[in-house]
Amino acid sequence: MIVKKLDDIIGTDSDVDTKTWRSYRFLLKKDGMGFSMHHTIIKENTETYIWYKNHLEAVYCIQGEGEIEVIDTGDVYSIQQGTLYALNGHEKHYLRARSEMHMVCVFNPPLTGREIHSADGSYPLAGE
């Protein structure tokens, strides 16, 4: 059994802070679950270009407001507490936060822990 608390994550290699988001990575590839799970905070009044070409992601908003824009279609979806979106087609998108958004994110394949978005908006596969 795996049991972790936020205090166990803060200030470790599983606490990744960037200009537009901070991610507390609770479950990673090394945990052997077949997916990774994170509590990610999207910083207020930010826009992040993302393209998970190597991963599938499901995201559940537990706090805050924003939107996701799918680049290829121009579709824009409102995000607020209680919203789930799943990037099941490797969609290129913009994630915008009107207020600080707290998100529970699940990735498959799992992340290893220190990934940040590359210039094309993606995370590398483990071992790349």
Each model region followed by its residue ranges:
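A short, N-terminal "cap"/entry segment at the start of jelly-roll beta-barrel domains
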Residues: 1-35, 49, 116, 121-128
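Glycine- and acidic-residue-biased ligand/ion/polar-headgroup-sensing regions
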Residues: 54-67
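Conserved short histidine dyad/triad with adjacent acidic residue
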Residues: 36-53
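A generic "binding-loop/recognition-motif" signal
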Residues: 54-55, 83, 91, 99-100
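Short acidic-glycine-tyrosine-enriched beta hairpin
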Residues: 73-90
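A short hydrophobic beta-strand segment most commonly corresponding to one strand
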Residues: 86, 100-116
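A cytosolic small-molecule/anion-sensing beta-strand core signal
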Residues: 62-63, 80, 99
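A generic structural motif
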Residues: 69-71, 96
